[in-house]
């Protein structure tokens, strides 16, 4: 919005030309989302407390979590608001990639909101019925996957980028739809599973978004894309604005979500953020990179799959409790230790992922 306005005002004052610079807009996008999140935090927490929108804790969970019962949840609303406002202010409104991410962010946010509402108002720990949650996640993912396919059909935008191999970029064709679907839905649920401790999910999300901001900048730059042997995508640059908005909103939310948390993001936040990261990865053609940089989300999800599979097949559990962060809690690790160590691992994985762009 402000970019469009600046383009019309630059004829009156050349200083408005600064709004055309991607680096400038990336910085102010981050700061805008950060300040909105910090401003909304105390007000939203107070409002959620007034409405008794408190966290519902499962009776079969770790005993240390019983003290979290009643902590305000659905704080993801302020994350989504911060991201959306910042992106609308600083990104080019004509960019289709930006709208694809916002569509998933808001759509999955609505699904998460309904899920949270059932939990906190109806006191139903299961929330939205699983099949309906999956149905709406799938519908949203398929719609945006089809739109993305039509935008980039028969171009590098539908090629598969394989790490370590600079000349291996097969054209996916209609398989693009299937891959996009699984990446978006899978990442959404993976972040949701990770969101079980104070600040555990939001910081890896910030790290991954920051990593993708660098990738988006390189992908949207002809020279750097050629240098790194990745597809040049002319719309990709504006995803930097989306990624930095996620970073800013995430850091602002962490101010209130750090241990001991004053507010939880709820499914309205975790499903939306995961869906947004998955969509960004697909748009940048970096699905494999997401697996590396988002390794914490992958391991959390695999721990649940292995736990359920082992119990059904052998009648035995592999972990004391899944997702795996609960396993370490039950081993006696203090919650802050689990959180910070997962953060460190996440940061390392993002750096490793970025390094793979050059190791080809």
Swiss-Prot record:
Stored Pfam families: Glycos_transf_4, MraY_sig1
Function noted in UniProt: Catalyzes the initial step of the lipid cycle reactions in the biosynthesis of the cell wall peptidoglycan: transfers peptidoglycan precursor phospho-MurNAc-pentapeptide from UDP-MurNAc-pentapeptide onto the lipid carrier undecaprenyl phosphate, yielding undecaprenyl-pyrophosphoryl-MurNAc-pentapeptide, known as lipid I.
Pathway: Cell wall biogenesis; peptidoglycan biosynthesis
Record organism: Erwinia tasmaniensis (strain DSM 17950 / CFBP 7177 / CIP 109463 / NCPPB 4357 / Et1/99)
One biological process term in Gene Ontology: cell wall organization
PANTHER family: PHOSPHO-N-ACETYLMURAMOYL-PENTAPEPTIDE-TRANSFERASE, PHOSPHO-N-ACETYLMURAMOYL-PENTAPEPTIDE-TRANSFERASE HOMOLOG
Broad EC category: transferase
Protein keywords: Cell cycle, Cell division, Cell inner membrane, Cell membrane, Cell shape, Cell wall biogenesis/degradation, Magnesium, Membrane, Metal-binding, Peptidoglycan synthesis, Transferase, Transmembrane, Transmembrane helix
Keyword Cell inner membrane: yes
Lineage: Bacteria, Pseudomonadati, Pseudomonadota, Gammaproteobacteria, Enterobacterales
Cofactor(s) listed in the protein's UniProt record: Mg(2+)
GO cellular component: plasma membrane
Subcellular location field: Cell inner membrane
Protein name: Phospho-N-acetylmuramoyl-pentapeptide-transferase
GO MF entries: metal ion binding; phospho-N-acetylmuramoyl-pentapeptide-transferase activity; UDP-N-acetylmuramoyl-L-alanyl-D-glutamyl-meso-2,6-diaminopimelyl-D-alanyl-D-alanine:undecaprenyl-phosphate transferase activity
Catalysed transformations (reactions): UDP-N-acetyl-alpha-D-muramoyl-L-alanyl-gamma-D-glutamyl-meso-2,6-diaminopimeloyl-D-alanyl-D-alanine + di-trans,octa-cis-undecaprenyl phosphate = di-trans,octa-cis-undecaprenyl diphospho-N-acetyl-alpha-D-muramoyl-L-alanyl-D-glutamyl-meso-2,6-diaminopimeloyl-D-alanyl-D-alanine + UMP
Its membrane topology: Multi-pass membrane protein
Stretches assigned to coiled coil: none
Family in the record: Belongs to the glycosyltransferase 4 family. MraY subfamily.
Listed transmembrane segments: 26-46, 72-92, 94-114, 132-152, 168-188, 199-219, 236-256, 263-283, 288-308, 338-358
């Amino acid at each position: 919005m402000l970019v469009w306005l600046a383009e019309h005002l630059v004829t009156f004052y050349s200083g408005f030309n600064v709004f055309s610079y991607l680096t400038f807009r990336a910085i102010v996008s981050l700061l805008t989302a950060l300040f909105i999140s910090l401003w909304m935090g105390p007000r939203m927490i107070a409002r959620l407390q007034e409405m008794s929108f408190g966290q519902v804790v499962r009776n079969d969970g770790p005993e240390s979590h019983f003290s979290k019962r009643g902590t305000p949840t659905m704080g993801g609303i302020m994350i989504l608001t911060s991201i959306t406002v910042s992106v609308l202010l600083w990104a080019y409104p004509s960019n289709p990639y930006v709208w694809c991410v916002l569509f998933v962010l808001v759509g999955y946010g609505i699904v998460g909101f309904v899920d949270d509402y059932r939990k906190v108002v109806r006191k139903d720990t299961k929330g939205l019925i699983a099949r309906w949650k999956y149905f709406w996640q799938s519908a949203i993912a398929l719609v945006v996957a089809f739109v993305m396919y039509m935008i980039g059909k028969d171009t590098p935008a539908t090629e598969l980028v394989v790490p370590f191999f600079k000349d291996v970029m097969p054209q996916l064709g209609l398989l693009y739809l299937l891959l996009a679907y699984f990446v978006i839905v899978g990442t959404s649920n993976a972040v949701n599973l990770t969101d079980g401790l104070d600040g555990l999910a939001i910081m890896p999300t910030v790290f991954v978004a920051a990593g993708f901001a660098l990738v988006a900048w390189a992908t949207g730059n002809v020279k750097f894309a050629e240098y790194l042997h990745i597809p040049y995508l002319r719309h990709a640059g504006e995803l930097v604005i989306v990624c930095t908005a996620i970073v800013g909103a995430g850091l602002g939310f962490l101010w209130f979500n750090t241990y001991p948390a004053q507010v939880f993001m709820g499914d309205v936040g975790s499903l939306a953020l995961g869906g947004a990261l998955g969509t960004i990865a697909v748009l940048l053609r970096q699905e494999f990179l997401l697996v590396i940089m988002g390794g914490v989300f992958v391991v959390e999800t695999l721990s649940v799959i292995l736990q359920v599979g082992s119990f059904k097949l052998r009648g035995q559990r592999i972990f004391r409790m899944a997702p795996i962060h609960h396993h370490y809690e039950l081993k006696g690790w203090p919650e802050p230790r689990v959180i910070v160590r997962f953060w460190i691992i996440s940061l390392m994985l993002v750096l490793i992922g970025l390094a793979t762009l050059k190791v080809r």
